[in-house]
Amino acid sequence: MDSIPNEDDLEKLLVAEQNVPYGKNYESFEDEENYLLELRNANALENLEHRSIPNDLFHSSQPVGSPTRNGDDIPSTLDLYSSDNAAIDTDISEDETINQRHAPQTDYRYPNTSANPKMGLEESMDIDMPSIDLDISNAAAFPRDSNLLFRNYNSHTKTSEKGSPVNFEKENQDSNVLFSTGRTSVLHIDAEQSQTNNTVTPLKDDALSLFSFENDVNGAVNDNSLDQKLSASKNSQRVSLPFFSKIELDEGSSFSGPKISARTSSGKIIYFPKKKNRHSDGLLLQPKRLADEISQVNEIGKDFNQDLLNSVRIWSENFLIVSKEKSVALKTEKLDSLQITNCTTKPQSQKLWVDTYRPQLFRDLLGDERVHRAAMHWIKAWDPCVFGKSRLQPSKSMRFNPRFTNITSDSDRPDKRIMMLTGLAGAGKTTLAHVIAHQAGYKVLEINASDDRTAHTVHEKVSSAISNHSALSSQPTCVIVDEIDGGDPAFVRALLSLLESDEKATEYSQAGNSKKKKKFKKLCRPIICICNDLYTPALRPLRPYAQIIYFRPPPQASLVGRLRTICRNENIAVDSRSLTLLTDIYNSDIRSCINSLQLLSLNNKRIDSETIKLLQPKSNSFSTSSLIQSLFLQLDNKQIRAIEASQPTYSHLDALLARIDGANDSESVLMNCFHTYLDLPFTDSLLSKPALTSEWLYFFDQLHSQCYKGNYELWRYIPYSIIHFHYLYATPEKCRLPHPPRSDLEALKLYRTRKEILDSFISTLNAYENQMHGERSILLELIRTILITINPTLKQKEDSMPRSALPSKIEHAINILNHYNLRFQQLPVGDGNYVYRLEPPLDELVWDAPTSSYSVRQMLSQELLKKRLADIKKQTLTDNPTSSNSSRKRKDFNSGKAIKRDFFGRIISEPKSEAVTSNNAALNTGDHPVSIKHAINIKFHDGFSNAVRKPISLNEILNF
């Protein structure tokens, strides 16, 4: 730990991590590797061809359990290489090799094993294979002391391979007579035994004869009982299709040709005959040539060779393929019928428990009932507007409950047009919104995080849903916007424009101005927004229009009871202590708890606390304090040996590095170590250890800066800059660590929160105040003065005074609140108590901020609301004159007499009567002469005309 990496070492690490192992020569490396592999295989095959298989294989020092032997001391396919005939018999003629090349092709009905020469038929098909019994008639020609030589059939080379001979004279002296004169004996080839032991066992008298040959008068073969006996077989077993051995029968007790001796591990000598050229016999026979081939066998008598069993193999395979196709077709029909009948139903095991046990009624909700009733009361306040019902009068308990008095309104809608549910994830906010919407009679339109939440979505979907009535459904629509705090800010701004349009439409409708009311849309349907963080900057402009309901997680006892009910319905044995541990792991997240129980129930119907502990995430399996204690604790040799006894590959350094790497925030771990190591006892008079620590901290900062620049491959070196605390300051005794100060992290969080509050307050000021004060002046001077003014201290007599005789300090506080757009919002604090909180909370920006009592803030809130309503009405009257004034102006304007003009605009003079002339003269003799103004209407018509035109200016028209 004395050598500390510098900047040069950091650059070397970065270059080493960014270099590709092969570089540009990757293809050459790959070609060279393939060449070496081919060369090695060629050398291995060459060595195999030049050795003597029987001598090298059976007279070797390999044990019986070696992979080059099987269980019966007989060479396996791995030893003999069934596809390589040259390794078995080296004296095969050249003509025989040519015959092998021109062997008949494999039938298309059989499995294709030509791609892999070493794969036999038993590895290529998996069907129900019954045992095969052969009834052999007229067996007098076959002596009892004959030798049976098994030859394995190779489908790739279309040839048979030598197997193990069975000497019935020596091996089966005590067994029953296999062939006898004057009766039909049965040769039984069992499927399993033929695959494992390559043995032939005599069949009992009561056994099933699968295939029999009996000579009739004409010398033909009677094979009509094949299908009947195959269908009557009830002893079929599910085994792999074995290779069918072929029997070669030679007269006499010794082989007629040359033979090869082999000695087993037990000392027994086995003789193998040399392979003969039998490729011209035609090993693969077509089914239509079966009868002719069998008749030839009966005529020859003693030449009962391999073609017999090969024919049996072909017949049995054909029959099994047909039977398998029929069974598969029958199963397919059954599955299709089941899918047709159950196409609309979903298996219960495939459904999520979260959907199965989702509350459907209001009484099934889990959590605080007061929060549920407040949300239900808000959505029922829309009934006069949506359903045309009369507004419900609040009960006596609701009249004095601040939770419900803020919701009700004098109009047919609540004061807050949208409701915002806020709380932790998994607490049940979305379920509550759906339940109260369905309970109130609405059809839900949900917009969640997976949808396109843009301004276009608001204008197309939301605006049409909340303004019109759907023609496809008789139910009105309630819009639920889930996770609105994580959406696009443009979506929030578009939703805010709908609320502002509704506010203006409501103002003009109350003022009686129907023309301007048509320009703005009225909000006619409820909107429910769901968020996790209420104080996200994107939700700042939306908070004043929302009825905020704080949703807290349900009590742990209620949550454990609901989980116990679910486990009882699903037949799962679990105790309450385990369920309590599960709720602690997921912080009362009911959705995660139910999903975890369903996951654990897949493998076991009994769940204990040890099983639930496995669900604990790796990052939460240990706290930061336990990690700090492990870093500063030095284990002795006895403890390390005890751990290594149970874990042979254990390394204490690797374990600490893994825990540091598994921590969520490496910066917080390093900061905790930095605040802790100075309080630990260590002897260092020269302060060399703190100097080394500062160097490692500098290296940590360099790594972080490189990672933030995009060099993420250096991230895995960060734990090495923290592990030095263990080498320098670890002690054998477990010291009691003090709580480290978290001033840096707490200050960072508080700075972000309070900066958001200050920005929201400055955004409400006008341009003159922003230019006059500035951000620093507002924070240090203006905010404290405002807080002192809006929190007046009233005496007991002044507090009980009537509203009409308010003191001047109350009036001044109301004016300040109205000028700076401040308000008091009522919030629950638990146990049925409420407080009035200043919005935005400027008191958090000032140390020892002044406060006032609940009654004073309640009075200020009510008087502020009255003042703002009065200002709105006054502004409406000034902007929109009354209908009487407008009608009077229109009447005076139309009282003027029209003047007659000709086509060119010249005035046509009319003779005036004497009475009119005298009256006009009388009016003109007054102090104020009367000037008659003529009405001029100008209208532009777009287009072209060939009529008589005259160039004229607008000034000439006005001065006519």
From Swiss-Prot:
Gene: ctf18
Stretches the record annotates as Disordered: 56-79, 91-113
Main localization (coarse): nucleus
Official protein name in the record: Chromosome transmission fidelity protein 18
GO cellular component: chromatin; Ctf18 RFC-like complex; cytosol; nuclear replication fork; nucleus
GO molecular function (one): ATP hydrolysis activity
Protein's job: Essential for the fidelity of chromosome transmission. Required for the DNA replication block checkpoint. Replication factor C (RFC) complex has an essential but redundant activity in sister chromatid cohesion establishment. Acts as a PCNA loader, loading PCNA onto primed templates. An RFC-like complex (ctf18-RFC) is formed where ctf18 replaces rfc1 in the RFC complex along with the association of dcc1 and ctf8. This complex is required for efficient establishment of chromosome cohesion during S-phase.
Biased composition (Polar residues): 58-69
Similarity section: Belongs to the activator 1 small subunits family. CTF18 subfamily.
Pfam families: AAA
Record key words, sorted: ATP-binding, Cell cycle, DNA replication, DNA-binding, Nucleotide-binding, Nucleus
Compartment(s) of residence: Nucleus
Presence of keyword ATP-binding: yes
Binding-site residues for ATP, renumbered to this chain: 423-430
Keyword ATP-binding set for record: yes
Taxonomic superkingdom: Eukaryota
Subunit structure comment from the entry: Component of the ctf18-RFC complex which consists of ctf18, ctf8, dcc1, rfc2, rfc3, rfc4 and rfc5.
Annotated GO biological process: DNA-templated DNA replication maintenance of fidelity
SUPFAM superfamilies cross-referenced by the UniProt entry: P-loop containing nucleoside triphosphate hydrolases
